[in-house]
């Protein structure tokens, strides 16, 4: 009997209050690592009407102006009009930072393996910055090997921001959210049930002042300029049965930090797989790569994506866990949900041999300390629209560079990954 169900994921635009915070946190991280690649950073940001608070723990030789960094990022996002209750030039920016605890620092600087002379391997030098568990996931539902609901939600959110920034839809404002419900049959996406867009907009649209007319104008424009282009290379598209909801409260004029406060790390499902895969609970933004919440989640995605790209599974989830101050993972788990072409035990053996999951090894493999300096900016660009499946960015953990090894090891034809 065919099982038919809906699965829903959401995304938010860069102007969403929580995403403002994520981006400021990662802008600070970029600036610090660009000057001092060994900076220890845990930058947290809070925003509210007319207010930005930067807090957390930072130990670095870098000299940066946190207030200027915050204002520059806020302006880049699009908050430049004080009449909207939040503006780069008029908001207050408060800074309250401490240094990293020496009790934590000693375990990161010299891992247990080094302290107790258990290993002289250079990659055993750095200990995990905290205990915890991280997940990575991939599936063959989209060209970028991501679940279709979150992939579509991100595409629509990015397009929503693009038509605002280019002036194609000049009445849009920075805050916005998207949501897509995909129809599945026996685990495969077969249709689009509902698309939801909530987008901040001006009080009037030129000569149009009636709210019903405003909402109809926005809805019609979003379908043509945002939704339709977002499905360009996706085989499954909206049809006559697809429900399309826009600003279902009736209007969305008050938005951004004037409408809701924001906080770094509150959009962890948006940042990852839209709820399709499990999540270890740790946020990414504002954290330097010794924090395994971030770096190990990137590594797990790399493992899972290569396994799926190699044709060894339709879906793959990887879990890794750590103890604070210890370099080597406490555990590694691989789950292919019955779609694997080889056993999870064999895949695990391969992963342990060919993928580096110690913090120092992850940092080295993806160049996580030096990449902001080399590219001019880096982490702030993944702080909105997802950290995975980004076809618009060159992300080291998205490379399918282990496919040939996997294919040779298990004699499977590889699939083409975006």
Curated annotation (Swiss-Prot):
K(+) binds at residue 44. The gene is metK. Mg(2+) binds at residue 18. Homotetramer; dimer of dimers. It comes from the Bacteria. One of its GO terms (molecular function) is ATP binding. Catalyzes the formation of S-adenosylmethionine (AdoMet) from methionine and ATP. The overall synthetic reaction is composed of two sequential steps, AdoMet formation and the subsequent tripolyphosphate hydrolysis which occurs prior to release of AdoMet from the enzyme. This is S-adenosylmethionine synthase. It comes from Gloeothece citriformis (strain PCC 7424) (Cyanothece sp. (strain PCC 7424)). Residues 100-110 are annotated as: Flexible loop. Gene3D superfamilies: 3.30.300.10. It is an enzyme of class 2 (transferase). L-methionine binds at residues 57, 100, 260, 291. One of its GO terms (biological process) is one-carbon metabolic process.
């Amino acid at each position: 009997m065919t099982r038919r169900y809906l699965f829903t994921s959401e995304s938010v635009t860069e102007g969403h209050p929580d995403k403002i915070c994520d981006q400021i946190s990662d802008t600070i991280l970029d600036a610090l690592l660009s000057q001092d690649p060994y900076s220890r950073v845990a930058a947290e940001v809070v925003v509210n009407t007319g207010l930005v608070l930067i807090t957390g723990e930072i130990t670095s030789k870098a000299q940066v102006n946190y207030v200027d960094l915050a204002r520059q990022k806020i302006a880049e996002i699009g908050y430049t009009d004080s009449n909207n209750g939040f503006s780069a030039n008029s908001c207050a920016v408060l800074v309250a930072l401490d240094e990293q605890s020496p009790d934590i620092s000693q375990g990161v600087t010299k891992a247990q393996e080094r302290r107790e002379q258990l290993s002289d391997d250079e990659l055993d030098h750095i200990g995990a910055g905290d205990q915890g568990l991280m997940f990575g996931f991939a599936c063959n539902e989209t060209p970028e090997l991501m679940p279709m609901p979150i992939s579509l939600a991100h595409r629509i959110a990015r397009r929503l921001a693009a038509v605002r920034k280019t002036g194609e839809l000049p009445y849009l404002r920075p805050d916005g959210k998207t949501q897509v419900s995909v129809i599945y049959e026996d685990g495969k996406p077969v249709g689009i049930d509902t698309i939801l867009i909530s987008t901040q907009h001006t009080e009037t649209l030129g000569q149009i002042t009636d709210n019903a007319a405003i909402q109809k104008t926005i809805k019609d424009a979003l379908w043509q300029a945002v939704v339709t282009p977002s499905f360009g290379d996706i085989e499954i598209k909206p049809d006559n049965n697809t429900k399309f909801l826009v600003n279902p409260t009736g209007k969305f004029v008050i938005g951004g930090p004037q409408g809701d406060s924001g906080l770094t790390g509150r959009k962890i499902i948006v940042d990852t797989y839209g709820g399709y895969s499990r999540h270890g609970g740790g946020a990414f933004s504002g954290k330097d790569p010794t924090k395994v919440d971030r770096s190990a989640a990137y590594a797990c995605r790399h493992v899972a994506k290569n396994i799926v790209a190699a044709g060894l599974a339709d879906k793959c989830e990887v879990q890794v866990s750590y103890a604070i101050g210890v370099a080597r993972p406490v555990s590694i788990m691989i789950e292919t949900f019955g779609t694997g072409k080889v056993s999870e035990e064999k895949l695990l053996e391969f992963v342990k041999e060919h993928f580096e999951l110690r913090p120092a090894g992850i940092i080295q493999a993806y160049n996580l300390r030096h990449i902001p300096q080399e590219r001019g900016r880096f982490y702030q660009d993944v702080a909105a629209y997802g950290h995975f499946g980004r076809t618009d960015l060159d992300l080291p953990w998205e490379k399918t560079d282990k496919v040939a090894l996997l294919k040779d090891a298990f004699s499977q034809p590889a699939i083409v990954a975006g």
